[in-house]
Amino acid sequence: HPAAVVRSRGTHFETVPYGDALSPGSEYNLESLLSDLRHVIRTVNPTQVIAPVPFDQHPDHAATAELVDRALAGTSCHPQRLGYLIHTSRIPTALVNTPARALLPPLRMRTYSWETYTLSPAVQQKKTKLLMVYRSQRPYVFLLRNAFVRRNELFFIPQEPATLATTLPPAAPVSR
């Protein structure tokens, strides 16, 4: 329910307790989150927005994609929406470091629109360092680094965010 207030597992608050936040004191609910996202989008007026794809198999990533798409739909801003895919059984995970190999779309998803951006070796090194910053993710990041630090970035180009979830394969739950 969009108006339902949730309690933070970390702070145990139901409202934003930080005075320097965008909306101090606002309730933790969907409408407040969308309002803040729309405010940031209107303020920044981005030409591109990069967020997870809605068919990512990790529920947090799929939910983030939906939130971003809902926020964009509620503004007059029309940036290019690019999506990145992390969790799917259709992307091969390299167990050895293969930065010279290209990151390609999963075979069953190659008919969708994808865009690649070439990364220099220096940018690949910087990306590896940034991935290793997330201590809570380190057991996973080591394998992901090998799978995702490649010679290019790969982005999904959605046709229309509002209909995206109905035109793509459903997300399957991720086992942890």
Listing of model-derived features with the role each one plays in the protein:
Residues 83-90, 121-123, 151-154, 167:
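Low-complexity, flexible helical/coil segments
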Residues 54-57, 86-90, 136-137:
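Short, solvent-exposed loop/turn segments at secondary-structure junctions
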Residues 95-139:
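A conserved mid-domain beta-alpha-beta active-site/ligand-binding segment of alpha/beta enzyme cores
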Residues 1-78, 125, 145-155, 161, ...:
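Active-site beta-strand->loop->alpha-helix modules in alpha/beta enzyme cores, enriched
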Residues 75-97:
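Short, flexible loop segments at boundaries between secondary-structure elements
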Residues 140-144:
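Surface-exposed patches in mature extracellular/periplasmic domains of secreted proteins
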